[in-house]
A protein has these predicted regions:
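Glycine-rich phosphate-binding loop plus the immediately following alpha-helix
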Residues: 113-115, 120-143
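Extreme N-terminus nucleophile/cap motif
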Residues: 1-59, 200, 241-245, 249-262
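Residue-level signal for inorganic ion chemistry
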Residues: 38, 109, 132
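Conserved beta-strand-loop-short alpha-helix elements that form
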Residues: 2, 103-113
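Gly/Ser/Thr-rich active-site loops/lids in small-molecule metabolic enzymes
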Residues: 128, 186-209
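Short acidic (Asp/Glu) patches
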Residues: 52-64, 78-100, 117-119
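Catalytic core of PPM/PP2C metal-dependent serine/threonine phosphatase domains
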Residues: 73, 146-186
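A conserved acidic, glycine/proline-rich C-terminal tail/linker
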Residues: 199-242
Length: 262
């Protein structure tokens, strides 16, 4: 399996601390050594860094670790390959344009007997993850030829994720740069940091940061991950089938495929 990393914040924020912890799991403290990638939204633009090498050994990952890019929405991924060979075209996150915006997607899991009909969006690589992303965007494009608000789009996203989940494991992060959508099939955790801020210690490497010194009292930053990245904070664990929509660090919608949306 792979591991996911997402962030939603109300001010441009760097994710160096969380990324430093995640990259250790790419071959050092974890087995996810088959590539990594991270995408930073900057307005309508997107900075995408990818490398099929293990993140713990990647010079590109070290560059990202040293270069504090500030963003309000971030999606990251470290890969342990199961479908598709280890190469750049199979490295998450995947990006496509829809409605004049960059849509970004990362997936943790594996889908069995998954061969959707390719229409407008087609995979470049040969992973089930990219095939699912293309299928999802094809559904959205067919149902909504013109842009709609994400609240109108949510039922379609949830329905598609529910179908993918029925074919295996489907934990995912999805964004268009304005919002961050999360769907949990088996494993996902979340923490929202806001004032009063305190220190945090990474689990995978001896690094501590004092968020009080790095933030303002008005900052709200939510981090999503497959497993908790820090050892001294309380992370909230998603239940299977649970989904959430984040905007500027706050949860604006949530629910479960088993229950009605909140």
């Amino acid at each position: 399996m792979c591991e996911l990393l997402g962030m939603s914040a109300n001010v441009p924020t760097d994710i160096v601390f969380s990324f430093t912890g995640l990259m250790q799991r790419g071959g050092r403290t974890g087995p996810h050594r088959d590539g990594w990638g991270i995408a930073f939204y900057e307005g309508r633009g997107l900075r995408l860094f990818q490398d099929p090498a293990a993140s713990s050994e990647s010079e590109v990952a070290q560059l990202v670790q040293r270069y504090p890019i500030k963003s309000e929405v971030v999606i990251g991924h470290i890969r342990q390959a199961n479908v598709g060979k280890v190469c750049l075209s199979n490295t998450h996150p995947f990006v496509r344009e829809l409605w004049g915006r960059n849509w970004c997607f990362a997936h943790n899991g594996q889908l069995a007997d998954f061969a959707p009909t390719a229409t407008f969006y087609r995979p470049v690589g040969n992973t089930d993850s990219e095939a699912a992303f293309c299928d999802l965007l094809n559904r959205v494009r067919e149902a909504f030829p013109e842009p709609v608000e994400v609240e109108q789009l949510l039922p379609s996203l949830i329905q598609a994720c529910t179908e993918y989940r029925s074919k295996g494991v489907f934990n995912c992060l999805l964004s268009d740069g304005d919002w961050l959508f999360c769907f949990c099939s088996t494993k996902l955790v979340q923490i929202t940091r806001r004032a009063p801020f305190g220190p945090a210690r990474l689990k995978d490497v001896d690094v501590i940061v004092d968020f009080q010194a790095e933030t303002t009292p008005h900052d709200v930053v939510t981090v999503i991950a497959t497993e908790p990245l820090t050892e001294n904070e309380n992370w909230n664990r998603y239940e299977p089938g649970q989904w959430s929509l984040w905007r500027k660090g706050e949860c604006v919608a949530s629910g479960s495929v088993e229950t009605a949306a909140q």
